[in-house]
């Protein structure tokens, strides 16, 4: 047995020297199953020590013995090498790596394909971009050619300038005609306003010169009216929910004299009315807003106003002074207001003086205006006579 082992060792040494490496049979079978493809030729790695080291004597003997058995029937898997040993296996990297070699080649091919694809895309894109640029350049050239032709046509003396001048003259003539037409319209409107015929005439249709009159008839616009509508006055001049027709003037004042109204019905004396506490008194049939109610049916709801006003007057020496005087104004009543048995005009102030008599509508009552310093002897006499008549009637 020892002789057989020594012969095998010698054979293995010779094969190592010749460059043929004999691997265990089990390892070769395993590699054939995993990698059916042809592996690249194994490159022999040079030994750092200079010579090819021979495996230990015990291992090749065992491997050779097992190899003889594997040649016959044995298919048992080979023993795994101890990872703790610092020695590396002398098999090339291609045999050590169990993963298929073509996977790495595919990865390299994919990496190499990317720049090729980019170049192809650029080649596909470049012709479209070049065509677009060519189209732009052609458009610019056309535009430049048109502009150059226009400039040359304008610079040329002849038909182009003549047509432009004719158009300008036609436009100027049309503008002048329109101006004349509108000036004539304005003159007509001014004449109508001066005569006083505005309103309905201002809405007449005025035909424009030239062309069909039916298509170009323009209605004249209505002029705005700046008159007072009275809406603001109604909003500000309401009392107890009723709109008052009258508004006091800026010169309204409260008098210093104590004026009074003495009403009489036929010869009967009625209670005295003191009218010096306000600047104005409204007389009418509407008791809700009237300061001095008048119950006669011939009187209006807002019949008249008794107003105090501050007015100027000239003294005896020629100087100008101011004084508060009483006035009466009719508010457009139906049956009118009478001052000393004379009807006064509506919406107009009339100055009142001492002992003036006022009557409203068809009422039989008379109102005599007096103040505190006026002579009331006649009224006192009438009162005494009335008292005597009452006593006589009572005695009889």
Swiss-Prot record:
Q: Glycyl lysine isopeptide (Lys-Gly) (interchain with G-Cter in SUMO) crosslink - at what positions?
A: 30
Q: Does the keyword Ubl conjugation apply?
A: yes
The chain residues annotated with the modification Phosphoserine are 35, 49, 52, 54, 58, 99, 153, 202, 394
GO terms under cellular component: cytosol; nucleoplasm; nucleus; spliceosomal complex; U2 snRNP; U2-type precatalytic spliceosome
Record PROSITE patterns = FHA_DOMAIN
Can you summarize the PTM annotation of this record?
Degraded by the proteasome upon binding to the SMAD1/OAZ1/PSMB4 complex.
Keyword set, alphabetical order: Coiled coil, Disease variant, Epilepsy, Isopeptide bond, mRNA processing, mRNA splicing, Nucleus, Phosphoprotein, RNA-mediated gene silencing, Spliceosome, Ubl conjugation
Compartment(s) where it occurs, according to its Swiss-Prot or TrEMBL record: Nucleus
Q: Where is this cross-link: Glycyl lysine isopeptide (Lys-Gly) (interchain with G-Cter in SUMO1)?
A: 30
GO molecular-function terms, A-Z: mRNA binding; RNA binding; transcription regulator inhibitor activity
Cross-linked residues, Glycyl lysine isopeptide (Lys-Gly) (interchain with G-Cter in SUMO2): 30, 108, 223
List the InterPro entries: Cell_Proc_Reg/RNA_Proc, FHA_dom, SMAD_FHA_dom_sf
State where composition is biased (Acidic residues).
383-396
Entry keyword annotation includes Coiled coil = yes
Disulfide links within the chain? none
- Where in the sequence is Phosphothreonine found? 57
Q: What does this protein do?
A: Required for pre-mRNA splicing as component of the spliceosome. As a component of the minor spliceosome, involved in the splicing of U12-type introns in pre-mRNAs. Down-regulates NF-kappa-B signaling by competing with RELA for CREBBP/EP300 binding. Involved in the microRNA (miRNA) biogenesis. May be involved in cyclin-D1/CCND1 mRNA stability through the SNARP complex which associates with both the 3'end of the CCND1 gene and its mRNA.
Q: What clinical condition is it connected to?
A: Neurodevelopmental disorder with hypotonia, craniofacial abnormalities, and seizures: An autosomal recessive disease characterized by severe psychomotor retardation, intractable seizures, dysmorphic features, and a lumpy skull surface. Patients are hypotonic and have poor feeding in the neonatal period.
Q: Subunit details for this protein?
A: Component of activated spliceosome complexes. Component of the minor spliceosome, which splices U12-type introns. Binds SMAD4 and CREBBP/EP300. Binds the SMAD1/OAZ1/PSMB4 complex. Interacts with DROSHA and SMARCA4. Component of the SNARP complex which consists at least of SNIP1, SNW1, THRAP3, BCLAF1 and PNN.
Protein name per the record: Smad nuclear-interacting protein 1
The gene it comes from is SNIP1
